[in-house]
Amino acid sequence: YYVTLESKSGSYATVKVTAMVKPLLADDATITAKDVTYNPKGIKVFVDTSKVPEDAAYTVAKVKNGSKVLSEDSYEYKDGVLTFNKNVAVGTYVVTFESAKYQDVKVSVKVNKAKGTLTTKAKTTVNTAIGSKSFNLGAKATTGMKVSYASSNKKVATVSSNGTVSVKGTGIATITVTASGSNYNTVTKKITIKVAPKKQSVKAKTAKKKLTITWTKDSNATGYQVQIATKKNLKGAKTYTVKSYKTYKKTISKLKSKKKYYVRVRSYKTVGKTKLYGAYSTVKSYKVK
């Protein structure tokens, strides 16, 4: 409707000002829109105008994100759907709807972060050994997310910015892979790297009813396991544990004279309650005197 204001003052001229005053909507006559999730291909916001008068014919006057007014080519409003193009990011947007007959209505729309994805070619647990070649975790994330890496124990394994893991010492390290981005929820994946001692080598000297077995001293190990048997497949072998890496010799007595024995050795590393075993040496045979 229109309001006319008239002013008269003494000998001054009469001034009339006519202005259109848009009525307010009733309290229950509102425009609403639900929050949405970010989509790199574009975002659709469904606007509910069912409670406003049919003759309101609301259109979008402007969209603001904080103090920034979005350019008109970054969105389109048609048939109750407000479509943002792919350049619109996560954030809170205030949409101003205008009508020729009613006062403007402001509606807040929140664009929430989307669920990102993160995959790796590497399994959740990787078993390797000292001397092994570096390998890549093969991580891939949703486009628009940045992948970063961190090692819990750089004395065991390091990881480069492109996800290449290098073995440094025996033990256990956890590689945390993180994918993050301004439009996505952060995703993390943990990969456990278990590094065992390297493969052992073994030699032995025979004597009267005994064998003196020697192997390579391994400072990356906690200790060693020595196996001896009368069968080549080591079925029924007796196992001896040497608990110090500094000891690299074991004499086994009370063996049968003129009997052939098969021996092999491996190193192990103790981490908490876990033992990491290196590969056994090649099986060697010796005939006791």
Question: Model segments located where?
Answer:
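Gram-positive cell-envelope targeting signals
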Residues: 215, 226-228, 252, 265-267, ...
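Beta-strand-rich modules
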Residues: 252-273
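Recognizes extended acidic, P/S/T-rich segments that occur
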Residues: 225-256
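Predominantly extracellular/luminal cell-surface or secreted proteins
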Residues: 61-63, 150-152, 227-231, 264-268
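Solvent-exposed loop/turn segments flanking beta-strands in beta-repeat/beta-sandwich domains
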Residues: 54-59, 217-237
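Ser/Thr- and Asn-enriched, surface-exposed coil loops between beta-strands
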Residues: 37-41, 131-133, 205-212, 244-249
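Extracytoplasmic soluble-region selector
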Residues: 1-12, 16, 20-37, 41-81, ...
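Pro/Thr/Ser/Gly-rich low-complexity, intrinsically disordered linker/stalk tracts
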Residues: 196-220, 274-289
